[in-house]
A protein has these predicted regions:
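C-terminal cap of thioredoxin/glutaredoxin-like
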Residues: 1-31, 65, 81, 154-226
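Envelope-exposed proteins and targeting segments
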Residues: 58-61, 92, 194-196
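Conserved S/T- and glycine-rich ATP-binding loop of Class I adenylate-forming
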Residues: 62, 70, 198
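Structural alpha/beta surface segment adjacent to cysteine/selenocysteine redox centers
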Residues: 66-69, 74-156, 190-193
Length: 226
């Protein structure tokens, strides 16, 4: 009887050790996979005068490469950005910049031109306009919806300080084309292949929705700055 009990104990011990080893291996492999799939850049192209939220001298920089036509970017702005803003931007630890990506053609370009025009008029109003464009994105996002009329309507409704006549003129003349060209060059320089792409102090995340990984990269950067 005692031998049987001893055998059961040994069996349970072996099973426990196997499970522990498997879990440990999974955690290690998962950590290594994140480390290898995140893209680390040794030389960071300057983002110049991009729309930026937060303290200018914040220790950590987070950049979003996004497209107003992109549903995944809308979701990131609704699900992840509010956490980032509360935890790090509003506390002065992170400055957040946005770069337009034109992966969806004419509508992407038109919305980028409008956003750049609003930014030039009023950097604070820009962020309201930016948010409202994404909110206006319909469920059927693939159907054409970004038009000059729609963008002017958003500006009139949510950014009353913006000169609508000037915005309309800028859209008709593509006044901010040079700024949009700069965004396209940044997209190329950073090797952006999807939207949204999130870069934390030179590390582009493989999964932009992994807020824990975003936090890990920020906390690591903050410690390195001390």
């Amino acid at each position: 009887m005692k031998k049987k009990q001893a055998s059961h104990v040994k069996l349970l011990l072996v099973i426990t050790l196997i499970i522990f080893a498997a879990v440990t291996a999974f955690v290690v492999m998962n950590t290594e996979e994140k480390a290898t799939t995140n893209k680390v850049m040794k030389e960071l192209p300057s983002i110049g005068n991009q729309p930026t939220l937060g303290k200018e001298d914040a220790q950590v920089s987070v950049i979003e490469f996004g497209d107003y036509k992109c549903p995944a970017c809308k979701a990131w702005g609704e699900q992840i950005f509010p956490q980032l803003q509360k935890d790090y931007i509003d506390t002065g630890k992170v400055k957040f910049s946005y770069v337009n990506v034109l992966f969806h053609g004419t509508e992407s370009k038109l919305s980028a031109l409008a956003a750049e025009s609003v930014f030039k008029q009023d950097p604070q109003a820009y962020w309201i306009f930016h948010k409202e464009i994404f909110k206006a994105q319909p469920e059927n996002h693939d159907a054409p919806w970004i038009t000059s009329e729609k963008l002017l309507e958003i500006a009139k409704t949510y950014t009353p300080n913006i000169n609508i006549t000037k915005l309309e003129e800028d859209l008709n003349k593509q006044t901010e084309q040079e700024e949009v060209n700069r965004d396209e060059k940044l997209t190329q320089d950073y090797g952006v292949e999807k939207t949204p792409s999130i870069v934390v102090n030179g590390t582009m995340l493989s999964d932009p929705y992994d807020y824990e990984e975003i936090k890990n990269l920020i906390e690591k950067a903050l410690k390195e700055k001390k």
